[in-house]
C-alpha cells in the first residue's frame, strides 16, 4: 500500500525486495442494495469513504493515517479505532479476501454476499497477520448506512468519579457507537480540561439520539457536568483523537506508540498507571468495552523503562502491550510483541504452512515470524 504501517511490528529481517500494492487501487464492485464493497488492497480509506457517502453508506473503520492508509494495510494490521464499540473489529466486517501466496499463486476465501461464510476462518487468519501469510490483493467488506444524527457527550473528572459511571453505562440499555476513556494529556490536547475524560457518541435517527443523550444525562452523578458536541464539533472531535495519537506527518521521530489490550475492568487502571508513569504528558485512549487502546509517549518519556513498566502492569491485568511505532534503536532493545501466551507453536505451524521459505514480511510478527 502506501507504507503507513511499515514501521509497525517487529523489524524486518533478511529483506531483499519490497512489493507495493499501491497501484492496486480500483473499486471492483459496490453493491449498493446489498451494502457490500469489493475493492483492491491499495484503495485509500479517506477518498473511499467520501465516495461511499454519496450513497449514504460507509465502511466502519477509522484507522491511523486515514488520508494515506489503504484497505490492505488496515486488514493486515487489524487497525481500527473508536467505531469498534458498535461495529466490531476489522475481521467482523470482512466477508471476502484474495491474496498472493508465497509461491505466487492466487488464493481466495469468502465472497461478495454477507451470508456467505465459506473461508471464514481464513479471513480471520489473514487479519492482523502483518502480511506474513500472504500479500493481500483484494477485499470484500460489509457496509453500513450513514446515520441521520450524531451527538457526542464528554464527561471530565477524576478517575474515582468516572470508574463507577463507566460500570453503570456498561450495564445500561444505551447503545453508543463509541465509548472511550482519554488520558488527561490527550483531553487537554483536544481543548478539554486536563483531566480524565469519557467520550460517548450516539448515532441514529434524531429522536433516538435525543432520547439516549437524555437517558445518559440522568445517569451522570452531580459533580460531573456533561459537554454536548453537535454537528461540526461532533464530526471533528473523533478524527482529532486519531490525529493526536498518529500525527500525519509525524512530528516527533523519537515517539513510541503502543497498542494495549485489556479486560474492560482494567481500562481505568491502565490510564491511571500511565498517568503515574508519565504525568501530564502521555496521550492515551482506551475503548471502554473492548479494552483495546493506544498510547503515545514522546520526548524523555519515550523510553524502554516506561514501556516495560506499563507492559508489566497490563500483563498483571491479563492483557498485553504491543509496540507499534518506535525508533529503530529502541525496537532493537524492546520485545516488540511481548507475547507470553501458549499459541506460538500454532503460529509457527501456520507460518510453515503458508510461507515455508520465510519470504513474506520476515521477522515482523510474534516470535520473529
Give the label of every model feature segment:
Residues 2, 9-16, 22, 66, ...:
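Conserved glycine-rich FAD pyrophosphate-binding loop
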Residues 6-12, 189-192:
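Short glycine-biased active-site loop of nucleotidyltransferases that positions the nucleotide triphosphate
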Residues 47, 160-165, 206-214, 266-272, ...:
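Short, conserved charged micro-motifs
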Residues 76, 95-250:
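C-terminal substrate-binding/cap subdomain adjacent to the FAD-binding core in PCMH-type
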Residues 37-38, 151-155, 196-208, 256-262, ...:
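Short cationic amphipathic helices and targeting signals
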Residues 20-67, 75, 79-112, 117, ...:
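N-terminal glycine-rich flavin-associated loop
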Residues 16-18, 35-37, 57-60, 74, ...:
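Structural motif
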Amino acid at each position: 500500500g502506501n507504507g503507513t504501517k511499515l514501521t509497525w511490528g517487529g523489524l524486518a529481517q533478511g529483506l531483499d525486495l519490497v512489493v507495493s500494492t499501491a497501484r492496486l487501487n480500483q473499486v471492483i464492485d459496490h453493491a449498493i442494495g446489498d451494502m457490500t464493497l469489493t475493492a483492491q488492497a491499495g484503495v485509500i480509506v479517506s477518498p473511499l469513504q467520501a465516495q461511499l457517502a454519496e450513497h449514504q453508506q460507509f465502511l466502519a473503520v477509522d484507522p491511523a493515517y486515514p488520508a494515506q492508509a489503504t484497505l490492505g494495510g488496515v486488514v493486515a494490521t487489524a487497525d481500527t479505532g473508536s467505531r469498534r464499540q458498535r461495529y466490531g473489529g476489522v475481521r467482523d466486517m470482512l466477508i471476502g479476501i484474495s491474496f498472493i501466496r508465497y509461491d505466487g499463486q492466487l488464493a481466495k476465501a469468502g465472497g461478495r454476499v454477507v451470508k456467505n461464510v465459506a473461508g471464514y476462518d481464513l479471513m480471520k487468519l489473514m487479519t492482523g497477520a502483518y502480511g506474513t501469510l500472504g500479500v493481500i490483493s483484494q477485499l470484500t467488506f460489509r457496509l453500513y448506512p450513514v446515520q441521520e444524527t450524531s451527538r457526542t457527550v464528554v464527561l471530565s473528572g477524576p478517575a474515582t468519579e468516572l470508574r463507577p459511571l463507566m460500570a453503570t453505562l456498561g450495564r445500561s440499555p444505551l447503545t453508543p457507537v463509541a465509548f472511550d476513556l482519554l488520558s488527561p494529556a490527550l483531553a487537554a490536547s483536544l481543548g478539554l480540561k486536563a483531566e480524565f475524560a469519557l467520550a460517548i457518541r450516539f448515532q441514529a435517527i434524531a429522536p433516538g439520539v435525543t432520547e439516549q443523550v437524555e437517558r445518559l444525562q440522568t445517569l451522570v452523578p452531580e459533580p460531573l457536568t456533561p459537554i454536548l458536541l453537535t454537528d461540526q464539533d461532533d464530526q471533528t472531535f473523533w478524527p482529532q483523537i486519531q490525529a493526536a495519537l498518529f500525527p500525519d506527518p509525524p512530528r516527533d521521530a523519537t515517539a513510541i506508540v503502543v497498542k494495549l489490550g485489556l479486560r474492560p475492568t482494567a481500562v481505568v487502571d491502565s490510564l491511571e498507571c500511565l498517568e503515574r508513569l508519565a504525568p501530564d504528558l502521555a496521550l492515551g485512549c482506551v475503548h471502554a468495552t473492548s479494552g483495546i487502546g493506544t498510547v503515545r509517549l514522546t520526548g524523555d518519556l519515550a523510553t524502554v523503562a516506561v514501556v516495560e513498566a506499563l507492559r508489566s502492569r497490563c500483563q498483571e491485568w491479563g492483557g498485553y502491550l504491543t509496540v507499534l511505532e518506535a525508533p529503530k534503536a529502541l525496537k532493537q532493545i524492546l520485545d516488540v510483541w511481548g507475547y507470553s501466551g501458549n499459541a506460538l507453536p500454532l503460529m509457527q505451524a501456520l507460518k510453515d504452512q503458508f510461507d515455508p521459505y520465510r519470504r513474506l514480511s520476515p521477522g515482523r510478527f510474534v516470535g520473529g515470524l
